[in-house]
Amino acid sequence: MITTKELRNKFINYFESKNHSHQPSSSLIPFGDDTLLFTNAGMVQFKDVFLGIEKKDFSRAVTVQKCLRAGGKHNDLDNVGYTARHHTFFEMLGNFSFGDYFKKEAISFAWEFLTKEIKLPVEKLWVTIYASDDEAFDVWHKHIGLAKERIIRIDSSDNFWSMGDTGPCGPCTEIFYDHGEDVAGGLPGTPEQDGDRYIEIWNIVFMQYNRHADGSTTDLPKPSVDTGMGLERISAVLQNVHSNYEIDLFQALIKKAQQVTHAKDINSPSLKVIADHIRACAFLIADGVLPANEGRGYVLRRIIRRAIRHGNKVGAKEIFFYKLVAELVSQMGEAYSQLIDKRELIEKTLIKEEKLFLKTIENGIKIFDAEIENLKDNTISGEVAFKLYDTYGFPFDLTADMAREKGLKVDEQAFLAQMQIQKQRSKEAGKFNVDYNSLINSQVKSEFRGYSTLIEDAKVLEIYQDDQLVASTSEQVSAVVVLDKTPFYAESGGQVGDKGILEGVGFEFVVEDVQKSGEAILHIGKLVKGRLNLNDELTARVSDKPRLATAANHSATHLLHKALKLVLGGHAEQKGSLVDEDRLRFDFTHDKAISRSEIEQIELLVNQQIRANYPVTTIEISQQKAKSLGAEALFGEKYGDIVRVISMGDFSIELCGGTHVAYTGDIGLFKVTSEGSIASGVRRIEAVTADKAIRHTFTNENKIIAIKDSLKANDINLIDKIKSMLEQIKNQEKQIAKLKKELLSGSSNDIKETNIGDIKVVVANVDGVDVKTLRNKIDDYKSKNTKVIAVLTTTNADKVQFVIGVSNALTTLIKAGDIAKELSSHIDGKGGGRADMAQGGGNNSANIDQALSQVEKFILNNIKE
């Protein structure tokens, strides 16, 4: 039996023998592609190559690509564990041609690999082609020798692939394996095609057309090939098993899952879920994703939590999920060394997330059970599902799973509507919303000269105004200018674009930002003088002060990155950065706040390298060579075959395309200005360098001097004086709280209480107290009365604050939240809360007595009903 590991290697070796360049799998996070949540196909890393935006030094490639389908349009999560072939994470075997070979060679390679290399019986194989693709038919029939009846024409989108509404597209041919008569299902194109007998094992896409906005197509000058074959699926065929979960790799993970969960039934779908999900979670964490409440981090969190619940379902009594990492590393670490490198981070992340979830899941299940007891039909509302998500961290699919087990369904549309309301929070927008890739001619190329000069004579290649290509632009008009060569650095790798001027005879163009599209460098700004025309000769001048300040900050991030690893540990990986002339911002993985002592160590390390005045050296070498030298490749970046390596003495070596100082001493001084959390497991440091670091130090010193002057203190007794003052404040606050309580108690005689049968109703305004005091009084009423409704307000100038309490025994008659809404309507306010407790405030205290009178009527009307 051929193992999954052997099959993976056999595929690579075969295509390398056919002059294909073996390219490593790209990250599960598609860099620079906002259209995808995760990499879900082998062609994703080559998308810009197919579009003609990016050039490679090879025309044939072979990959084994990590893929994930668990979010967005491509989402297999709900089916995982319940079918034979659905997965969140999977490996896609692929061979690619970029304007090299086409249909004859692509089909021949696939057929030879299947029938000669891995020896699949020819009689077990069937193929489909696009209905009108006679060329593919001829290759299969005349060249390969496949019988006509085994070639099925399909006239549907199943056999025609496109990258989008516009762009490269073309017909497909698919190869199917027949599992035999004992398995239900019919041939592709028949009504029974959805059965499991005939399984697609290889899809070959022929990108030969370019689809235009009007729907028409034209031939591509260089047709290409994109193929994909699921490793798990072809492994199942070769290992003579029907389900992907029966292959060697999954069986090892399933056995481990049974061991750590103490499950009794090895065939439980829950064990398949766990075995699948550990792969997805481990690879996501290794690629830099950490659990969060939105975006990719939320997808990871929901996968982790789904696995945990399935573990609990089959008997797990303690945290278990992280215990599968060792087995996963054993199975896949040889092919993916990142699993070995990131093992500690993966295990720590899973342990932390599982502990966090176990703290909340019990409460969430109680809420779920309480809600379904009151159901009037078999549908759980979207509002309840959202409450479970928002308050208890339950992913929607977890709620749906729990509902399905009880024969119920969830209103997903209403849940999504609630999610959409929540998402209306403002988010940081980019500076530009123009799709420059579609705007700029893909053949245009700008040569960047800015590493060695800030001034360059250049020629105007293209001008864009209002998203349109124009021959010239006039004064005071915003435009985008493309030059044949430029010293301007385009925003990339966290470093902002340069600013400066393009000037020529009779014109001046102020460059406000610089972006890149393919190989074109875009100078974005405004013509402030004269007229600018195509082919004009000009001088491009980068503003030197911002560039030099930015370079100092960028070099400092490299030193900071290494210092973080030395002080905090190797897990401190870069998650993002922003470098401009004023500051640097650096995001990295770490699961707790950095102590003052650690910050001091980090600053000391960085400043030691600055004082050492190491030369900052640059070399361009192959990516393979750079990695062998130990160069840090940063998360999310997309690197070419030849990479630029920046070294600072023996301290730091990183792949980087940004601009840097000549010597570390040029940074001057490094000072951390802030440190904090931006997401679960992700911290952010902000810092300044050079003159700004000195000014920051002066500012802090001046603040300390001002504090000493105010407290009449000196360097020796300042801390003691501050501690003494804080202790005095604390004692005074206790005294104030005591006086407020006494004030409220003294006012109790003036508070009107109404008894309606055995229900006590209290509605009153009490001045001179705070909300905490009101809340304590409400709790006091509720503890001393089994049936009480209490509404207490306090006013300060025109502001009103209120607290409302309703005994649990009365919440079926009236809810505190409803009373809050009624009161808010009379005081220009808002408020809300639970059925038994609510609070809020308003901006109109003038009519507080009238408002309370209306609220009392509202209460009495409700309880009398």
Curated annotation (Swiss-Prot):
It is found in: Cytoplasm. Its cofactor is Zn(2+). Keywords: Aminoacyl-tRNA synthetase, ATP-binding, Cytoplasm, Ligase, Metal-binding, Nucleotide-binding, Protein biosynthesis, RNA-binding, tRNA-binding, Zinc. It comes from the Bacteria. GO terms for molecular function: alanine-tRNA ligase activity; aminoacyl-tRNA deacylase activity; ATP binding; tRNA binding; zinc ion binding. Binds 1 zinc ion per subunit. Consists of three domains; the N-terminal catalytic domain, the editing domain and the C-terminal C-Ala domain. The editing domain removes incorrectly charged amino acids, while the C-Ala domain, along with tRNA(Ala), serves as a bridge to cooperatively bring together the editing and aminoacylation centers thus stimulating deacylation of misacylated tRNAs. This is Alanine--tRNA ligase. The gene is alaS.
